[in-house]
Amino acid sequence: YSKVATEAQKLDGYHSSTALSSYTKENVYGKLKAMLSAGKLRRYVAKGALIAYVNSTIMDLLEQSTDFTRKIEMTQIAEGGIGIETRITDIDGVTLIEVIDDERFYDKFDFTDGFVPVKKVAANESNHVAAETGSHKINVLIASPLTVKTVPKIASIYYFNPGQHTEGDGYLYQDRSLSDTFVFPNGKDNKIDSIYVDVDTTEYAGE
């Protein structure tokens, strides 16, 4: 997420900053529609080639949106009983994916030791400390699978029999993978126009 968000923040007209608290059930649908029509994103909407990653709070509000009516149907579930599905998972052909692991949903990270959001640092000239902008939680991240590709760099599988490792007495299976994400320009004018990010206004200040 952070790699695509960083690229979107470099583009005019393809990023915004909105306080999460300003989203309401009355305006959430309109805000999402405005994002999906930003710049040249309509081209990708028409092709059915956009995915929107949305945080849980906004998904909850969209479910309660006052901009449209909904029909809730009950369905039989395999274990018996009745289930209902109320989540909105598509707008005009754009798939909406709820990001449950919100600790990963920031616009930048410090990868020095694992991955942690960048903490806001205030300038302190007497101690020669430069100011640093903290990470922002992502509200909505939009991308096209036509131009955003995740490429594996390393993909290794290891299998150890009992006695061949020090992690216990059983068999040990290890799967190690490392990937990177690239955002490619379109094939018409060599510009990036298939991504968009909206972030919260609050900077990360540490736990």
Report each predicted region and the residues it spans.
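Structured, hydrophobic secondary-structure cores that serve as assembly/anchoring elements
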Residues: 25-75
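Sequence/fold signature of self-assembling virion shell proteins
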Residues: 1-30, 64-207
